[in-house]
C-alpha cells in the first residue's frame, strides 16, 4: 500500500507566530495518530527596500528597510480521516499563511 502524505508549508513575518502554529499542527496530528516529520525550518527570505530619505534630492542620504519571511515545512505521513478533520477545525493566528498539498 502506498503511503499517503500531506505537506504543509507555513509562511509568516514573525518567527514566534510561525513556531506556535507549527507546534499546534504537530500536536494535533500526533494526538490523532499521524506520523509527523518536522517542522523543518526552510531558508528565511530577506527583501530589502532602499529609499531616499529626502523627497527631492540628496541621493547620498538613503534609508533601508528589510522584510523577512520565515518558512516552515511539516509532512504528515499516513494521516487518518480524524487528522484531516482536526486540522480543518484548527484555529491558527491571522499572520500565518498556510499552503497544503495532498
UniProtKB/Swiss-Prot annotation:
PROSITE patterns: RIBOSOMAL_S10. It comes from the Bacteria. GO terms for cellular component: ribonucleoprotein complex; ribosome. GO terms for biological process: translation. GO terms for molecular function: structural constituent of ribosome; tRNA binding. Keywords: Ribonucleoprotein, Ribosomal protein. HAMAP family: Ribosomal_uS10. Belongs to the universal ribosomal protein uS10 family. Part of the 30S ribosomal subunit. Involved in the binding of tRNA to the ribosomes. This is Small ribosomal subunit protein uS10. It comes from Oenococcus oeni (strain ATCC BAA-331 / PSU-1). The lineage of its organism: Bacteria, Bacillati, Bacillota, Bacilli, Lactobacillales. The gene is rpsJ.
Amino acid at each position: 500500500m502506498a503511503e499517503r502524505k500531506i505537506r504543509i508549508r507555513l509562511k509568516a513575518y514573525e518567527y514566534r507566530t510561525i513556531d506556535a502554529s507549527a507546534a499546534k499542527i504537530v500536536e494535533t496530528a500526533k494526538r490523532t495518530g499521524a506520523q509527523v516529520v518536522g517542522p523543518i525550518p526552510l531558508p528565511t527570505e530577506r527583501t530589502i527596500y532602499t529609499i531616499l530619505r529626502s523627497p527631492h534630492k540628496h541621493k547620498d542620504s538613503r534609508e533601508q528597510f528589510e522584510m523577512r519571511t520565515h518558512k516552515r515545512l511539516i509532512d504528515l505521513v499516513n494521516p487518518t480521516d480524524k487528522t484531516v478533520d482536526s486540522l480543518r477545525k484548527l484555529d491558527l493566528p491571522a499572520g500565518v499563511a498556510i499552503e497544503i498539498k495532498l
